[in-house]
Amino acid sequence: MSSVMHYYPVHQAKVGSYSADPSEVKYSDLIYGHHHDVNPIGLPPNYNQMNSNPTTLNDHCSPQHVHQQHVSSDENLPSQPNHDSQRVKLKRSRTAFTSVQLVELENEFKSNMYLYRTRRIEIAQRLSLCERQVKIWFQNRRMKFKKDIQGHREPKSNAKLAQPQAEQSAHRGIVKRLMSYSQDPREGTAAAEKRPMMAVAPVNPKPDYQASQKMKTEASTNNGMCSSADLSEILEHLAQTTAAPQVSTATSSTGTSTNSASSSSSGHYSYNVDLVLQSIKQDLEAAAQAWSKSKSAPILATQSWHPSSQSQVPTSVHAAPSMNLSWGEPAAKSRKLSVNHMNPCVTSYNYPN
């Protein structure tokens, strides 16, 4: 009896070492016990500490077991290059088609870009190829065909975009020419003044009669040439330049031609081009009549070229304008076009000597 009583307290102490009561364990804790911190089945308290701290496992394990773990971890390291080498070996090499196979495939592609399976198998057997090789070749060939089509379409689209720009530049030039007729004539006076003037011959103190007669004939011919040249210059200036039209005329008293600047208007006016051309024609006719009636013989007799003075540099003389063209005047707007209007471009004037 005493022996039994002596054994019982030892048994009670062993049972008391468990911290949890089996009657209080829940069903969910039994299933998901490894996710909770609570010990569901009454394991020793040192069990959770061993799982949380892995270094304690090595302390309790034998040295032989630790050595086996290190060996197994070292054996796992060289296993990765083996997998990489296997992957490199599994990489498919590019198929090298022969010239005969390429010709047959190209002919088939021209006839039909898309193949159904029976036709693909037939071509593969005939060319000693796999069905997959024929399928991939047709896919690549279709992609190349689409790229070629897109490459041809891009230059056409660029050319279409360039055409409107050229048309716009042409329209701008037309608009500038039309706007030039309504601009202020004062803007063009500066350009007319910058034109080089004709040089006047120096006066010879000993006049020569033969030289004076020769100069008279040259002056008479120059008057006709200058008038026609001035008229063509005016028409060209109206059609091409963007500034207001200006007229240059020649004076017969000095035997040379000078430029005459037009009077500027007070503001911007828009006139009809035909009216402007008609006013130019009338002013030129009036100036031609005045030139024919002028007596330039006494003046020309006193002017001649001297042989010793040919090396001298001629001087430029700005003569006063011989006529006044009403470019911006309201009177030019009220003039009416005559029925028998002659084209000033082809009109020629013959002046008497």
Swiss-Prot record:
Basic and acidic residues compositional bias, start-end: 148-157
Annotated GO CC locations: nucleus
InterPro entries the record matches: HD (IPR001356), HD_metazoa (IPR020479), Homeobox_CS (IPR017970), Homeodomain-like_sf (IPR009057)
Compartments where found: Nucleus
Predominant place of localization: nucleus
GO MF, one annotated term: DNA-binding transcription factor activity, RNA polymerase II-specific
Compositional bias (Polar residues): 48-83, 210-223
GO biological process: amnioserosa formation; compound eye development; positive regulation of transcription by RNA polymerase II; regulation of transcription by RNA polymerase II
SUPFAM superfamilies according to UniProt: Homeodomain-like
Keywords linked to the UniProt accession: Developmental protein, DNA-binding, Homeobox, Nucleus, Transcription, Transcription regulation
UniProt feature, compositional bias: Low complexity: 248-267
DNA-binding segment(s): 90-149
Disordered: annotated span: 48-92, 148-170, 202-223, 242-267
UniProt function note: Required for the differentiation of the dorsal-ventral pattern, and does not appear to be involved in the process of segmentation.
Protein name: Protein zerknuellt 1
Source organism: Drosophila melanogaster
Classification lineage: Eukaryota, Metazoa, Ecdysozoa, Arthropoda, Hexapoda
